[in-house]
């Protein structure tokens, strides 16, 4: 392996190339727009931020700029030409020595470069274009096709020109520049692919460590997953667009069938996978940014090491050459691994394309079935419309009948409420009648007791009369004896006469009291008889009224039951229901009250 002094001589260290890939879109309307870079331009050169103070002046002097002429004209004019720079020979093949006397050669190649419609500055990047998702060469849009590169100068050897197959994004067989270019992102194009391979080669070539190489391999694995998702998203977007294009306007809204449901499920799955694809793309862009920063930082550090003091330069050059040899070997292995992964991805892409074709055939068969079922569906819809009209008419009639039934039911409920009220009143009257009957019984018992008391008083009065008569007879006898005694001689018992008179007065007073009590009792008894007779008349009248109301309520209930039976049978659906709530008048004299 030769020394790396050629990297220091001249400005070849900064002469990084910009290789654009030609992308031709098959159907721009069938593809979805993905995220682009913010500037939409090719990145050119490395960042020249100096990490060490002593090498800053040298870095400023060794900077080199490449200008690319960009001519933006209207469509249909001649294609502007500008020179494309390539660093294909910068690293050489794995195992070939570097030549310190000869600088690396630039490989010119003609290709199409997609340019933004707003900016003309072009900068290279350290990434290589990836495979198109359709498995074939993508075609550029009409706007991007107007910008082309200048053809190679005639003095350059033809062996160094790149073949057109490189425009398809395939990796080189020799392993050189496997990760040195990136497809440009144009703001005017409708679809672009994200870069796939991270910048591992140049980083390892300028003294990269095994840790950095391992990080590059990890980034490559994640980018391979991103390419798989991109390839499946292409088929999904095409299928989704074919579903949208096959839809046609229809005058009658057809119900969703199971086939359309399956189509919608497939479209939903495709949309979910596209969302996962966008997430993978965002993560890939973050990793790409980190790798690009590491890629730009590594050459600067290598240059600072190479531009150090002279005594240490030889050892560092040897170490750098050994590291570059190891890096070239690792890169060769990585290229082989990437080629193997590329073949696997192509196989997966073919399987996905087959699956897409199968889904498209299923979709076409579903569409044919849909068109074949169209006339029968229209006939059934017409019949359904007729039946719906009949159903609406029947519903209207049913509503009218329901309103009538509701009115009758409300009337019946009102009558039931009235019946309940009258029954409550009757129960109250019955309770009142029972109370009056109980009071009447108690009065009768009291009357019997009073009669018995009156009879007893009468008996006592008779006894007192008899006693008074006996006492009067004795008094007369005593008076007669006293008169005889006066006539015959002095009185024998003059002290007994006042006592007998007092006793006589007392007995007379008691007799008067007894007579007064008897008169009062007889007048009370007479008053009680009159009150009892009045109460009896009232009770009899109330019983007659109660029986009359019972009979009227019974007749009304009979009529209501007949009306309910008629409503239940539906005989008088169109005839108005007449209910006589007053009832027939019963003569009051015909009611016979029960005896108390």
Swiss-Prot record:
Changing residue 119 to E: Found in an esophageal cancer sample; esophageal squamous cell carcinoma; somatic mutation. Highly expressed in testis, prostate, spleen, thymus, ovary and brain. Detected at lower levels in heart, placenta, small intestine, colon, liver, kidney, skeletal muscle and pancreas. Not detectable in primary tumors from breast and prostate and in many cancer cell lines. Residues 178-190 have a biased composition (Low complexity). A lipid is attached at residue 2 (N-myristoyl glycine). InterPro entries: LZTS. Keywords: Cell cycle, Cell membrane, Cell projection, Coiled coil, Cytoplasm, Lipoprotein, Membrane, Myristate, Phosphoprotein, Synapse, Tumor suppressor. It is linked to Esophageal cancer: A malignancy of the esophagus. The most common types are esophageal squamous cell carcinoma and adenocarcinoma. Cancer of the esophagus remains a devastating disease because it is usually not detected until it has progressed to an advanced incurable stage. This is Leucine zipper putative tumor suppressor 1. It comes from Homo sapiens (Human).
């Amino acid at each position: 392996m030769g020394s790396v002094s050629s990297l220091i001589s001249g400005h070849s260290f900064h002469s990084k190339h910009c290789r654009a890939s030609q992308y031709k879109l098959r159907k721009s309307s069938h593809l979805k727009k993905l995220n682009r870079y913010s500037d939409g331009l090719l990145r050119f050169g490395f960042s020249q931020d100096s990490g060490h103070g002593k090498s800053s002046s040298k870095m400023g002097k060794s900077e080199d700029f490449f200008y690319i002429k960009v001519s933006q004209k209207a469509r249909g004019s001649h294609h502007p030409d500008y020179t494309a720079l390539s660093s294909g020979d910068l690293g050489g093949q794995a195992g070939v020595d570097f030549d310190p006397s000869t600088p690396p050669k630039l490989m010119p190649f003609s290709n199409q470069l997609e340019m933004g419609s707003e900016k003309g500055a072009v900068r290279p990047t350290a990434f290589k274009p990836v495979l198109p998702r359709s498995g074939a060469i993508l075609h550029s849009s009409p706007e991007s096709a107007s910008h082309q590169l200048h053809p190679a100068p005639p003095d350059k050897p033809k062996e160094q020109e790149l073949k057109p197959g490189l425009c398809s994004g395939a990796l080189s067989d020799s392993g050189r520049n496997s990760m040195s270019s990136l497809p440009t992102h144009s703001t005017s194009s409708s679809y672009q692919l994200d870069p796939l391979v991270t910048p591992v080669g140049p980083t390892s070539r300028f003294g990269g460590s095994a840790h950095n190489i391992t990080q590059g391999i990890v980034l490559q694995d994640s980018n391979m997953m991103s390419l798989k998702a991109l390839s499946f998203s292409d088929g999904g977007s095409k299928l989704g667009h074919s579903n949208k294009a096959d839809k046609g306007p229809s005058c009658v809204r057809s119900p969703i069938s199971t086939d359309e449901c399956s189509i919608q499920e497939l479209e939903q799955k495709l949309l979910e996978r596209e969302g996962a694809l966008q997430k993978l793309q965002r993560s890939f862009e973050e990793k790409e940014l980190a790798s690009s920063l590491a890629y730009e930082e590594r050459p600067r550090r290598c240059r600072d090491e190479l531009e150090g003091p002279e005594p240490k330069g030889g050892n560092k050059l040897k170490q750098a050459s050994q590291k570059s040899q190891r890096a070239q070997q690792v890169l060769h292995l990585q290229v082989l691994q990437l080629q193997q992964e590329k073949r696997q991805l192509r196989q997966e892409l073919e399987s996905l394309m087959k699956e897409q074709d199968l889904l498209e055939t299923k979709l076409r068969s579903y569409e044919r079935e849909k068109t074949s079922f169209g006339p029968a569906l229209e006939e059934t819809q017409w019949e359904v419309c007729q039946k719906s009209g009949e159903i609406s008419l029947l519903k209207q009639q049913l509503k009218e009948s329901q309103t009538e039934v509701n009115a009758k039911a409300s009337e019946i409920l009102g009558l039931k409420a009235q019946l309940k009220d009258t029954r409550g009143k009757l129960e109250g009257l019955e309770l009142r009648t029972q109370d009056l009957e109980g009071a009447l019984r108690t009065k009768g018992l009291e009357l019997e007791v009073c009669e018995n008391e009156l009879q007893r008083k009468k008996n006592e009065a008779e006894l007192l009369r008899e006693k008074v008569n006996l006492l009067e007879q004795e008094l007369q006898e005593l008076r007669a004896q006293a008169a005889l005694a006066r006539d015959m001689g002095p009185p024998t018992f003059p002290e007994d006469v006042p006592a007998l008179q007092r006793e006589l007065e007392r007995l007379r007073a008691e007799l008067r009291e007894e007579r007064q009590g008897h008169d009062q009792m007889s007048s009370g008894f007479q008053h009680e008889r009159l009150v009892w007779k009045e109460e009896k008349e009232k009770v009899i009248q109330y019983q007659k009224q109660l029986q009359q109301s019972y009979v009227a309520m019974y007749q009304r209930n009979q009529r209501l039951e007949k009306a309910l039976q008629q409503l239940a049978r539906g005989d008088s659906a169109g005839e108005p229901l007449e209910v006589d709530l007053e009832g027939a008048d019963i003569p009051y004299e015909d009611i016979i009250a029960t005896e108390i």
